[in-house]
Amino acid sequence: MVDNKIPEPGPAKLKRNAGPDEWLEAAKDCKYLSEQHMKQLCEIVKEYMMEESNIQPVSTPVTICGDIHGQFYDLLELFRVSGGMPDGSEAEAPKTQSAVITSDDIEPPSTISDPKLRKKLRNTFAPEDGSEDSSASQRDRSSSSGSRDVELKRNFVFLGDYVDRGYFSLETLTLLLCLKAKYPDRVTLVRGNHESRQITQVYGFYEECFQKYGNASVWKACCQVFDFMTLGAIIDGRVLCVHGGLSPEIRTLDQVRVVARAQEIPHEGAFCDLVWSDPDDVETWAVSPRGAGWLFGDKVADEFCHVNDLTLIARAHQLVNEGYKYHFANQNVVTVWSAPNYCYRCGNLASVCEIGDDLKPTFKLFSAVSDDQRHVPVSRPGRSEYFL
């Protein structure tokens, strides 16, 4: 049985002259906007995005979020774990147990190689007596370590793949666009490989829009927003955020800054590589099994970070069971994954990565909210269709 306080999905019932404030409140409640309001929202957000650089500068403190994939109720949990939405509303306690992992806990190159740390995670997410106290202590730890960050107003960088596969792609994207419209300087939406016309026609977002509106006009408006999403973000000039990875055509950040981004994602080239590439155990470059982008190795990452004076490349794009993963011994590439129990069947943890002014990453891990904390659409696609 679903808790009656849980946001119930459905169409928003707003006056015709409603604006961003009303849209945001409706979006928080898992309501999708009318066709008219959604198109207005897309135009507002598009105007802000047109002014952004291909690599948008962002100041610390920052919360970096990975793939969401239409998992609306887990996105709400992400905000609870992160201390609240950018609107400054009072943060709720997480519905699931969470853990805080700092860079001091990590032994390269594996994500979690320390047996003590593995035990810590196992104990944190195991349903044991006293777990509530454990969760509270974790929150105390994170709140005390981040109190200065709260005062400075935390920024959010989302690394793309907001839609497809999950049950509520439209509502998820609507909430993020509303936050962008209301707080344009505090929310950065990076483009992922799923923010494209071709991919969304295959993996669910197009079909969802058509089902809810009876036509494709809102989907088209959202795709125009996708075209203006930034290709990356740079935190305090030292931490690069992209969806996928690096490109053999890109050696410097200035080369990214001059890429023509206001278009559908090309099938090859630098733009394509930024949203499709993956780090892997290769020396330099290798052909990607995805059919787009490249696999890049530690030598490539080391050189790119050296040339561009970077301490870290934060990216998403790949499911990692423990919520995040460092890929190389130098710990200069990390995957952040923010869709727990991906496709409602993978059983994985999720994380957000918090970067303070010392530029040391702290990971907050969380799991999917329980069934009584979410709604499931009656006419939902079969899970096998989405697990592609």
UniProtKB/Swiss-Prot annotation:
Cofactors (names): Mn(2+)
UniProt keyword annotation of Hydrolase present: yes
EC id: 3.1.3.16
Family annotation (PROSITE patterns): SER_THR_PHOSPHATASE
Top-level taxonomic group: Eukaryota
Amino acids binding Mn(2+) 2: 161, 193, 243, 317
Cofactor notes: Binds 2 manganese ions per subunit.
Active-site residues, record numbering mapped to chain: 194 (proton donor)
Keywords attached to this entry: Hydrolase, Manganese, Metal-binding, Virulence
Source organism (scientific name): Aspergillus fumigatus (strain ATCC MYA-4609 / CBS 101355 / FGSC A1100 / Af293) (Neosartorya fumigata)
Residue ranges of the region described as Disordered: 86-146
Residues noted as binding Mn(2+) 1 in the record, renumbered to the chain: 67, 69, 161
Cited PANTHER family: SERINE/THREONINE-PROTEIN PHOSPHATASE PP2A-RELATED
Function, in words: Protein phosphatase that acts as a modulator of pkcA/mpkA activity involved in the cell wall integrity pathway. Plays an important role in regulation of adhesion, cell wall integrity, biofilm formation, and virulence.
InterPro entries: Calcineurin-like_PHP_ApaH, Metallo-depent_PP-like, PPA2-like, Ser/Thr-sp_prot-phosphatase
Keyword Hydrolase: yes
Name of the gene encoding the protein in the UniProt record: sitA
Enzyme type, top EC level: hydrolase
Single Gene Ontology MF annotation: protein serine/threonine phosphatase activity
Free-text disruption phenotype from the record: Leads to decreased mpkA phosphorylation levels, increased sensitivity to cell wall-damaging agents, increased levels of beta-(1,3)-glucan and chitin, impaired in biofilm formation, and decreased protein kinase C activity. Also increases sensitivity to several metals and ions, such as MnCl(2), CaCl(2), and LiCl, but it is more resistant to ZnSO(4). Impeairs the virulencein a murine model of invasive pulmonary aspergillosis and induces an augmented tumor necrosis factor alpha response in mouse macrophages.
One Pfam family, short name: Metallophos
Protein name per UniProt: Serine/threonine-protein phosphatase sitA
Protein family: Belongs to the PPP phosphatase family. PP-6 (PP-V) subfamily.
Catalytic activity: O-phospho-L-threonyl-[protein] + H2O = L-threonyl-[protein] + phosphate
GO BP annotations listed: cell adhesion involved in biofilm formation; cellular response to oxidative stress; DNA repair; fungal-type cell wall organization; G1/S transition of mitotic cell cycle; intracellular signal transduction; negative regulation of isopentenyl diphosphate biosynthetic process, mevalonate pathway; regulation of actin cytoskeleton organization
A cellular component term, taken from the record's GO annotations: cytoplasm
